């Protein structure tokens, strides 16, 4: 199924869900890819960047990632998933979402996956973010 592409329907049906836990961002060298495969239960995302592999992971892997990366681990973040199945070609959903969060002074890191869009917001602002999204 291709998912919803109409912006009004997407906004009406997005039903943001606050996921349990704290999440972090880090980067590791590409040579660590096989090592990462042993920790997939706590990894939400791996993205290849020119500087290395950008990793989003749960708090349970914080110590492991600290050993694998020589760089700063960023977080904690809360994860809000938009439960509507959005079409990857849909126009405007993330623009609306990030705009309403920006107006509340809430930073957001968004990841669009195959079925849903996912928002990482500062953990201490998670309830504020949910309230802002409810305005849409």
State where each predicted segment sits:
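Predominant activation on well-ordered alpha-helical scaffold segments within soluble catalytic domains
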Residues: 95, 127-130
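Short, compact, well-ordered microdomains
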Residues: 85-114, 118-120
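Short amphipathic alpha-helical patches
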Residues: 34, 38, 121-128
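Regulatory modules associated with amino-acid/nitrogen control
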Residues: 1-83, 87-96, 134
């Amino acid at each position: 199924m291709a998912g919803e592409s109409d912006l009004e329907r997407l906004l009406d049906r997005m039903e943001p869900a606050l996921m349990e836990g704290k999440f972090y961002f880090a980067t590791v060298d590409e040579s660590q890819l096989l090592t990462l495969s042993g920790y997939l239960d706590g990894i939400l995302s791996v993205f290849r960047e020119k500087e290395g592999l950008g990793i989003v992971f749960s708090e349970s892997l914080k110590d492991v990632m600290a050993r694998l990366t020589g760089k700063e681990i960023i977080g904690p973040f809360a994860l809000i998933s938009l439960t509507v199945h959005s079409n990857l070609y849909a126009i405007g959903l993330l623009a609306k979402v990030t705009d309403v969060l920006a107006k509340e002074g809430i930073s957001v890191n968004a990841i669009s996956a195959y079925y849903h869009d996912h928002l990482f917001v500062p953990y201490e602002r998670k309830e504020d973010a949910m309230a802002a999204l409810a305005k849409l």
